[in-house]
């Protein structure tokens, strides 16, 4: 499928910068008005997942959209709420789910979530489909939620329910090692520290809850994902180390196997992404994957001003899903 380099994403001139696009929505976007209903489901390994349900506006055929958030995010982040609002207006019931430990309460197990964990996404999707016998479903993911989504669709296409008609993923670090290297640069220290502050707090909490089982020596001195993932994320989730984790959890090797219409949107000025996160060759070889590369948009930014109070990402996702599903 084509690589769409001439995107119609045109942010306001004053926001024509990847860093500004990334930070502006976090600081200044009003929280979209949504009132989801929360549901808790059990996982097969004795843990739980918290789901937020948003009901479609108006009457029509029952259709389900599942939204996956980004690293250390949650289902009520502004970008999730904005997407949920856009899709419910188009007649989709929306299920926005929280990764383990991201719903406001620690999960029960020592393990948490990771960037390539597709089992929980599959569990959420199958639960959602069964709740109302939805005939049609679509997937939307942001950042590592997008990586999970793409990996899920491609690693075992036979496992994906037939009801899944299309998918959209934004700002995806589909090569996790490349993204980790980019974020380790001095220019991105602000973002790295933002995430590590949250991850360190979770490591300390897990250590207290599980009787001091973790080695926290040097935790505060860790300044990169590589160091944190090598000590915590990788061993807690069955990987040999950070390098093994990044290799096995990345969606990049699975993109050509995707069998449903899928739109991957990565802005060229995204400060989180390496060149390897723009998989033009995989898109060209795929019959289903479209890669769109707006000149600007930052990381999960895509700010746009319009009378509907929607961001460009929300309009683009709604239009693609309507056409593909």
In which residue ranges do the predicted regions lie?
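Short beta-strand/loop motif that positions the catalytic acidic residue
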Residues: 258, 264-266
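The serine-hydrolase catalytic nucleophile loop
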Residues: 73-85, 275-276
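Short beta-strand element of the alpha/beta-hydrolase
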Residues: 62-70
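Conserved alpha/beta-hydrolase
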Residues: 76, 84-108
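N-terminal cap/lid segment of alpha/beta-hydrolase-fold proteins
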Residues: 18-58, 303-305
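Alpha/beta-hydrolase-fold enzymes
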Residues: 2, 130-134, 138-236
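Catalytic nucleophile-loop/oxyanion-hole region of alpha/beta-hydrolase
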Residues: 86, 102-138
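Catalytic histidine-centered segment of alpha/beta-hydrolase-like enzymes
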Residues: 297-311
